[in-house]
Amino acid sequence: MNDLTAKARELRCNLTPQEKILWNILKNRQFYGYRFLRQYIIGNYIVDFLCKEKHIIIEIDGGQHNEEKDIVYDTKRTKYLNSKGYQVIRFWNNDIDNNIEGVYKILQQTFGKDS
């Protein structure tokens, strides 16, 4: 097993509280029948949640993503994922904690289920 695979496995076993909240919405095809994978490797990156069918990645960001070096890294990462045909949606931990209904509505819109 390579380092990235081991890291992805570790992350799957240690979801953040916000990842657990969103995973409870997405797992077992509960969100409109779509299948999601968590802590999935794409290239040299591990994404929080992936819906292969729709080529949509959902990322949950903590406060560390506000720092300059992390903003640069996230921008590079998102450009790479976009170049591979993926749409990347980002939510802050605060969004999950304080506005899960709003997060759900954004997901509905993104997946074309808002009607």
Range-by-range predicted roles:
Residues 32-34, 38, 43-47:
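Short beta-strand or tight-loop elements
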Residues 11, 15, 21, 43-110:
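Basic, amphipathic alpha-helical patches used to engage nucleic acids or provide basic targeting signals
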Residues 1-34, 83, 113-115:
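Solvent-exposed, charged helical/coil patches
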